[in-house]
């Protein structure tokens, strides 16, 4: 049972519990009308201390499609955070009004602190460059739905692997499934963090390699997970400008790829995927965004215990 639980890290749920969520998402996709009122009388609080389009909108759409309601803020200046209120006090107060909360915060660990003080389930909607577990659930559901399995895959992660919380969460999650391998493609300055390399991959004897050119790895990939270089994580604009065009996926590079490779991206896109790829059936990032709403519907229903 997931009722009353928090989701702060992709490792919080067992593989069996993840499969519970995915099976419910499958049911929602097949017969959405059956779920129109399962959250009648329930309220989701969206506490977004950082800008968001897909994550916030998909949480809100998920709750509304389940028959629930939404309260919250989309940037801290519109709340008492601007007056200096702590995360702990904010979540205690919100818990008086809402049944479940989704929090995005620029500081790593802020949702975990909120969960310590909360009487309602807390979902980490992204904390700094740390974790983004609901994006990971989105990615896993997308792969599971379109590939049929989450094992025996070669996954390429490309772009900002240092600050990319979606990549960190995805590698942690996919490392739990059998016979998955990873290829990391990034500038030297944006390499995958040591804690992922040592504590997740090497500790569990998971095969991985790092390459400097996309073309060197494209032919072996089942999944290519693209990320943008994140301007908001840089203190020096010159560094951002120098690195932002490091890896761009275009039609020429796609010639090296398998016919059934999937291109995923957590979005927003800047320039790292050429628009011509939108017409390629291997470009699955907008399907991925839709799966995000369904998996969040399933997650909310499970944590509230209404399904």
UniProtKB/Swiss-Prot annotation:
Q: Does the keyword Oxidoreductase apply?
A: no
Pfam (any one): OTCace
InterPro entries (alphabetical):
Asp/Orn_carbamoyltranf_P-bd, Asp/Orn_carbamoylTrfase, Asp/Orn_carbamoylTrfase_sf, Asp_carbamoyltransf, Asp_carbamoyltransf_Asp/Orn-bd
Q: Which reaction does it catalyse?
A: carbamoyl phosphate + L-aspartate = N-carbamoyl-L-aspartate + phosphate + H(+)
User: What GO terms in the biological process aspect are recorded for it?
Assistant: 'de novo' pyrimidine nucleobase biosynthetic process; 'de novo' UMP biosynthetic process; amino acid metabolic process
Instruction: Say if the entry is tagged with keyword Transferase.
Output: yes
Q: What class of enzyme is it?
A: transferase
Instruction: Specify the domain of life of the species encoding this protein.
Output: Bacteria
E.C. code: 2.1.3.2
Record: residues binding L-aspartate? 83, 165, 228
Which keywords fit this entry according to its UniProt record? Pyrimidine biosynthesis, Transferase
Assembly and interaction partners: Heterododecamer (2C3:3R2) of six catalytic PyrB chains organized as two trimers (C3), and six regulatory PyrI chains organized as three dimers (R2).
Q: Which family does it belong to?
A: Belongs to the aspartate/ornithine carbamoyltransferase superfamily. ATCase family.
Q: What does this protein do?
A: Catalyzes the condensation of carbamoyl phosphate and aspartate to form carbamoyl aspartate and inorganic phosphate, the committed step in the de novo pyrimidine nucleotide biosynthesis pathway.
Record-given protein name: Aspartate carbamoyltransferase catalytic subunit
Q: Record the organism.
A: Clostridium botulinum (strain Okra / Type B1)
């Amino acid at each position: 049972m997931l009722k009353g639980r928090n989701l702060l890290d992709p490792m919080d749920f067992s593989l069996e519990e993840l499969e519970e969520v995915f099976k419910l998402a499958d049911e929602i996709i097949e017969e959405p009308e059956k779920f129109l009122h399962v959250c009648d009388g329930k309220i989701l609080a969206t506490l977004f201390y950082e800008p968001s389009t897909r994550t916030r909108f998909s949480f809100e759409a998920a709750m509304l499609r389940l028959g629930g309601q939404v309260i919250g803020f989309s940037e801290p200046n519109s709340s008492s955070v601007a007056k200096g209120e702590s995360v702990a006090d904010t979540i205690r107060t919100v818990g008086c009004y809402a049944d479940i909360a989704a929090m995005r915060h620029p500081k790593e660990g802020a949702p975990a602190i909120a969960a310590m003080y909360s009487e309602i389930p807390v979902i980490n909607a992204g904390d700094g460059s740390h974790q983004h577990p609901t994006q990971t659930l989105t990615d896993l559901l997308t792969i599971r739905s379109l590939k049929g399995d989450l094992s025996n895959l070669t996954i390429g992660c490309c772009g900002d692997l240092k600050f990319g919380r979606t990549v960190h969460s995805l590698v942690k999650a996919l490392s739990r499934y059998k016979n998955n391998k990873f290829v990391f493609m990034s500038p030297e300055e944006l390499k995958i963090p040591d804690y992922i390399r040592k504590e997740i991959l090497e500790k569990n004897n998971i095969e991985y390699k790092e390459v400097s050119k996309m073309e060197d790895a494209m032919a072996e990939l089942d999944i290519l997970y693209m990320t943008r270089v994140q301007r908001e994580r840089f203190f020096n604009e010159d560094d951002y400008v120098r690195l932002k065009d490091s890896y761009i996926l275009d039609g020429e590079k796609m010639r090296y790829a398998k016919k059934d490779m999937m291109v995923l991206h957590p979005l927003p896109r800047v320039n790292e995927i050429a628009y011509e790829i939108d017409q390629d059936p291997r470009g699955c990032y907008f399907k991925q965004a839709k799966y995000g709403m369904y998996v969040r519907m399933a997650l909310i229903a499970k944590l509230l215990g209404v399904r």
